[in-house]
Amino acid sequence: MLTRRFLAFAAVVIFISGAGLAAQKSASLTAQDFVDIQTLYARYNWAIDAGDAEGYASTFTPDGVFNNNVGHDAIVKFANTFHAGLGAHVKHWNTNLMILPTPEGATGQVYLVLVDFGTKPPTLFTSAAYSDELVKTALGWRFKKRTTKGDVAPAPKPPQ
């Protein structure tokens, strides 16, 4: 009786493990996918920094989301507003890109530093992190959803 329970338990564990491995294998990215996704990140930065609102919006799916901007038109409007206010003198720098496969496409995380070139010498304007949902479309990889979380400096320590 105990042997049957053990064998049944072992069979369930093996089945679940196999299903997990199958899901991992189906969620994989090729070397070309990684290159294409890195290129998407670069296109995003170059477009927003150059004031190319349509090029910037084209890095998203038509129903894409950037923070609270939903859809192509809202993303174009955001890009135009950003560039009119800050964009002419700031540049986006990304580092530590991490791309992970998902059954739907991929997730991405990357650090963002905005450098203000309107000051002499150039200064760090702000820093943040992006969290992304990416999908592969007929036009290539696109952002489905992109959220930004700004870095917050710790509160100063009280004098002792």
What does each model-identified segment do?
Residues 1-4:
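N-terminal secretory signal peptides that target proteins for export/translocation
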Residues 8-18:
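Bacterial N-terminal signal peptides
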Residues 21-50, 54-62, 73-74:
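Short, low-complexity N-terminal intrinsically disordered segments enriched in polar/charged residues
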Residues 53-114:
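A solvent-exposed, acidic/Ser-Thr-rich amphipathic alpha-helical stretch
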Residues 87, 115-124, 153-154:
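Short, cysteine-centered beta-strand-loop-beta hairpins and adjacent loop/turn segments enriched
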